[in-house]
Each structure stands twice: as C-alpha cells, then as structure tokens.
Amino acid sequence: MNSNIKLFAFGLLVSAASLASAQQVLLNVSYDVAREFYKDIDAAFVPYYKAKTGKDVKVEQSHAGSSAQARAVADGLDADVVTMNTTTDIEFLAEKGVVAKDWQKRFPHNAAPTTSTMLFLVREGNPKGIKDWDDLIRPGVQVVVVNPKTGGNGRYAYLAAWGYVRKKGGTDAQAFDFVQKLYKNVPVLARGGRDATTAFLQRNIGDVLITFESEVESVNREFGANKVDVVYPSFSIVAENPVAVVERTVAKKGTADLAKTYLDFLYTPEAQEIAAKHYIRPSSDAVLKKYADKFKPIKLFTVEELFGSLSQAQKVHFNDGGQFDKLYTVK
C-alpha cells in the first residue's frame, strides 16, 4: 500500500514537472505607457496560442521609459521580444547585435503594428484655455513632458513641437526658439510616460501634459472619467510603435517561433481591435474605420517628412551636444 502511495505521489510530481516544462515563458520588454494595452493583448494571446499550437504559454511584461528599456536589454535583460515606441531604440539594439539588422523587414508596416500621436491633457474645464502649441509657451503655463533622452514619449513631444513650427512655414531657427520657450515652461522632466502622468495627476504638477493619445484611456481607467480634458493640437506627429524579436534571447531559450507568433498576433483583427479600444491607432484600415469615433481627425506629419528619420533626428537633436542640450537648461 505504501509503495502504491509513493508511486502515485511520484507520478504527480512527474506530471507537475512535465506541465511546468511544457509551459513556455515569453518576456515582452516594452515602453512605459503600454502596460494596460499589453495586459489585454496577453490575455487574448494565451488562448490564441493554445488553440494554434496546443501549447501553454505565460507572457511576462516589463515597462519603463523606452530608451532605458533598450539599454537594459542590451545589458543582458532576457527579453524575447521588444515592443517600443521609437525605431531608434530598436535600431540601438540592432547595432548591438541583439536584434536582427533587417528587423523592420520581418513584419508588416516596417514592423510597426500600431501608431499613436501626441496630444495635450489639461485640467478639467481647461482653466488655462489651452488650444494649440502656441499656448504652451505663454507665461504662467507649466508643461509636463518626458525627458527626450530617456523616453520615446519625450522625443515625439519635442519633434511634434518642432514640426508644428515647420508645418506653419517656419525655419529651423524659429523652431529652435519656439521649443526653447516651451521647455522653459517645463518645471521638471519626467523619466517616462507613466511618470509624467503621475506627476500631472497625482502630484498636481503643471497645467498641461503632452503625451500619447493612448494615455487618454489609461487616465480615464485609473483616475476616473472627466478628470482631464483632451486637446487636439492643429498639427501633430505620427508616432510608430515598432516591434522586434530579440535574437540573442530566443536562440538561447529556443523561443524563436513563440516570439514570432506573438508579434504576428499583433497584426490580427483581434489584436488590432484591442489596440483601438486603448486609443492606439491600428495599422488595419478596416479596424481604424470601425473605431473612427475614437480617433479625432488631426493633421499629421511623419518623422521622415521633416527630420529624415528618427536616427537622423537622434543625432541632430538628442545625442550629447545636440539641439536639445543647447536649448534646455537643467533647473
């Protein structure tokens, strides 16, 4: 009898061990304000992957400022995939040999399943009367924004402000002066998008927050509806959300197929609808049309149109000694 019990217990242990080994774990290292979006994506992906392969999977998430995340992956954080909000952060990983050199060719739309844009969140009732970029340089207006050296949110905010001047017919010199005035109204630079939102809503810093369109849903969910008003400026920038497989990790863990399937899933109608529900603009025209009520028409320009590429913008504006360092004085 005792031997039977021992055999039964041993069998349970073997079964548990087999189940644990059968379940693959995928780590998605992502940007700061994508937590809720990827939480919903992961909840949908697990049953999708089970139905597709018959295998169980657990998806883990890591979120912080996109540039800080890229550096962490370069330094050894074992991400299976990276889902960022600027191409420069993935280019950085490609240069380090962590991501494939041709990463943009491995998935549709230059490996960007979704996009966003930059807009303004203001206090309920818009007490400072913020309507467009020009209002952000008025005396007495405090602007909360992410440090462009630590997060893609901050880089896009900076480039959107610069591009606004250029789209109105201004020169680069005029854009420099405008953006310099804007950053003089910034009391403190946030490290990441969620840090900026926390500063604005929990610490009550500033009159206006420049952030991704997707933060509207996050703010409503976390802090309650109608805590902020949304202001769409006359011009803003297309912010791509690129993705890539981390070749170094998947080669070591044997998760290449899982990682590719996960990123492929982001292009499915189901995932594209999840994006739209989070105010993230889907690459699918059909889904974008279906959720047209969520995305107010706005005049958008691309990075390529005004800056050549994000890599070029990085060199000119955000590298040490670049335009940002020249116009911003640490307070």
Regions flagged by a language model, labelled:
Residues K168-S234:
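Ligand-binding pocket segment of bilobal, Venus flytrap-like solute-binding proteins
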Residues Q23-G151, A292-D293, Y328-T329:
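N-terminal segment of the mature folded domain
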Residues V29-Y31, V122-E124, Q142-K168, L182-V186, ...:
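Short beta-strand->loop
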Residues G125-K131, T150, G163-T171, T249-D257:
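Short helix-loop capping/hinge motifs at secondary-structure junctions, enriched
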Residues A112-S116, F178-Y183, A190-R191, F223-A256, ...:
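Periplasmic-binding protein-like
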